[in-house]
């Protein structure tokens, strides 16, 4: 557990609820993040603890939570990821992306596949000594892609179609749901 938990009580593992009254759902560009999220991105000390516990990174998926947080900082400051010296996203070379506060995050700063590689297990959040909420930022960006642009990965679209047709993401009828 995080060493800071003793000072502020236990951390919630719940995602922040979606504000359906907001003019835009989710986060499109770095400037759309809340001030405390931006402060968290800037507070990152690049210790790599999030990277070390990330199952997606360990499995070779195109996600590195440490680089993602650094990329959000690049997005707010403007510039490119060429100065990043750590491990990149597996399969995606460093130096391909540029960011600015009012520029769309996907695909200019981060690839959509990077966001969808996250399992939302929150291991990165639990390990972070700076209390950065990696998963909330990822989910906010996914919400924009899904709810504003209508973009979901292929598996996500199948699960949504199954929910509509059968009331469960596996696509099984209620009588056979337990037959796996």
Language-model features: locations:
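Short, glycine/proline-biased beta-turn/loop segments that scaffold the active-site neighborhood
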Residues: 72-74
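Charged, low-complexity, helix/coiled-coil-prone segments
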Residues: 8-18, 55, 156-166
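Acidic, Ser/Thr-rich low-complexity segments on the non-lumenal side of membrane proteins
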Residues: 15-58
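Juxtamembrane segments of multi-pass membrane proteins
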Residues: 52-55, 63-70
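Membrane-embedded alpha-helical bundles of multi-pass integral membrane proteins
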Residues: 1-27, 70
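Iron-sulfur-cluster electron-transfer modules
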Residues: 32-41, 67, 76-180
């Amino acid at each position: 557990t995080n060493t800071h938990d003793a000072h502020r009580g236990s951390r919630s593992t719940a995602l922040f609820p979606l504000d359906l009254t907001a003019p835009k759902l989710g986060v499109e560009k770095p400037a759309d993040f809340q001030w405390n999220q931006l402060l968290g991105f800037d507070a990152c000390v690049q210790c790599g603890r999030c990277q070390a516990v990330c199952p997606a990174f360990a499995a070779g998926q195109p996600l590195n939570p440490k680089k993602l947080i650094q990329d959000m900082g690049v997005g707010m400051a403007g510039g490119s990821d060429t100065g990043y010296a750590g491990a990149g996203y597996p399969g995606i070379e460093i130096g391909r992306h540029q960011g600015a506060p009012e520029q769309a995050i996907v695909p200019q700063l981060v690839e959509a596949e990077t966001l969808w590689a996250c399992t939302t297990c929150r291991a990165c959040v639990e390990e972070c000594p700076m209390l950065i909420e990696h998963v909330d930022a990822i989910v906010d960006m996914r919400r924009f892609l899904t709810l504003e642009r209508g973009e979901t990965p292929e598996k996500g679209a199948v699960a949504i179609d199954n929910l509509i047709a059968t009331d469960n993401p596996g696509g099984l009828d209620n009588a056979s749901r337990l037959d796996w």
